[in-house]
Amino acid sequence: MRLEELSRLLVGARVNGDPAAEVKGVAVDSRSVRPGDLFICIPGVRQDGHDYADHAKRQGAAALVVERPLDTGLPEIVVKDARHAMAAIACHVYGYPSHEMKVIGVTGTNGKSTVTHLLDHIFAEQGAVTGLMGTLGIKFGGRQYPTLNTTVDALEMQRWLRLMRDAGTEYCFMEVSSHALAMGRVKGVNFRTAVFTNLTQDHLDFHGTMEAYKAAKGLLFSRLGNTFSATPDGRKYAVLNADDEVSREFANCTAAHTVTYGFSREADVRADRIRYSPQGTRFRIESFAGEAEFHIPLVGKFNVYNALAATAAALCEGLALSDIAGRLATAKGAEGRFQTVSAGQPFLVIVDYAHTPDSLENVLSTISEFAEGRIYCVFGCGGDRDRTKRPVMGRIAARYSDCVILTSDNPRTEDPRAILEEVERGIREEGMPSSDYYIIEDRGLAIEKAVDLASPGDVVLIAGKGHETYQEINGVRIPFDDRVVAEQAIRRRMQ
């Protein structure tokens, strides 16, 4: 590839140096540069790729993409936004793989993982070759690959989409985070349908305000045009939660056809006659495609919303409502989402990823509907993240639980004790007496304490980390899995 060829992809770009210079590949990490690569200098929050241009040159880089000219002696493409340039170049290098697949994106504060997993199950059971990208990693071709972020960067995004397509993938179900939208990670991805779950407080450490957070989520819908791979009826769809007022704004900013879901009578896909149990949920769905009875092996109102979102998206793809109901009857939730841990104990232990005020309240309110005995809640809040939600989550835990055990989540670079004090403030504000809550910084000991306290009929909720297999302390990821630790604690008690 020549620099002049790549520069034509980028609005307002100019080439300093030889426009005929050839590059063989693309890199954004100087450590991974190979001879002949184009190194894209990405300015970040903690590090600036421009500072690593000389290292990239020593590694053999043939040219650079920069936001400001550098004195390296290498030819450069100078652009206004290196992240957007990376996305455009990545699409070109990997041959626009999303145009060869049916990509359905899911965004929202809570429910992204479950909705994408439900969609993956529905379509795989229908005989389609499917792939998943999200918090739990990337899955296709019968294999799972770990990732650091919910949505990988633009270069990795296009590389994985190309690998998926070359493996025969027909449908890709993708979690799309607000960070990814704000930072251009999904720029150039040709979404066929975009799904919105809900918007509640989270990530204010990054976005600053709820308005900015909402605006980032809205980018998925404002960019959803009517070109390239549309659904069988020739349209692209925005699938929106009718019970979340933000959906009205998203509907007004998209060129796509909108389909709504929820409990509201105005929803295009609506659930009623809902019956909850610890084993699952029964309900009826009425829709523009008819009505059907559903029984899903997932618990709680929030999972009815997740099933509605997946159903609405599947209907947009032309699937029959009765087929969707049949597929969801055998669906499993995403790992670490309301996942039970059983080792013969006479009480229920649930591990859930709930790490926002809304998700914690959803899980605890669901448990309160069927719990026969006391509810024990083990949780903490992550470090280097939105501090304002800490006392809010403390109040929620105290409101719905009989006993709260505060512990570390991923403290990252913060003092774990300082985080716990901020959460404890909310517990006290809710009026929970000190005799009803414990502060145990060591997460393993906190889980063991809850298991030891539980009696027959009680429920222990271990919230915040879900599927994660590590605990991040002082920048180091230490192996830790709530599910494994809980099972070990149960087995010790049952001996």
Indicate residue ranges for each PLM-predicted region.
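N-terminal leader/targeting and accessory segments in enzymes
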Residues: 1-88, 92, 267, 299, ...
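Short secondary-structure boundary segments
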Residues: 66-69, 176, 198, 408, ...
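Receiver (REC) domain switch/active-site residues of two-component response regulators
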Residues: 62, 192, 402
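Phosphate-binding loop of NTP-binding sites
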Residues: 86-240, 248-254, 370-371, 494
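Residue-level signal for inorganic ion chemistry
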Residues: 6, 37, 56, 89, ...
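ATP-dependent carboxylate-amine ligase
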Residues: 1-14, 35-38, 289, 312-322, ...
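Acidic, Mg2+-coordinating active-site environments of NTP-dependent enzymes
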Residues: 67-73, 191-348, 372, 426-427, ...
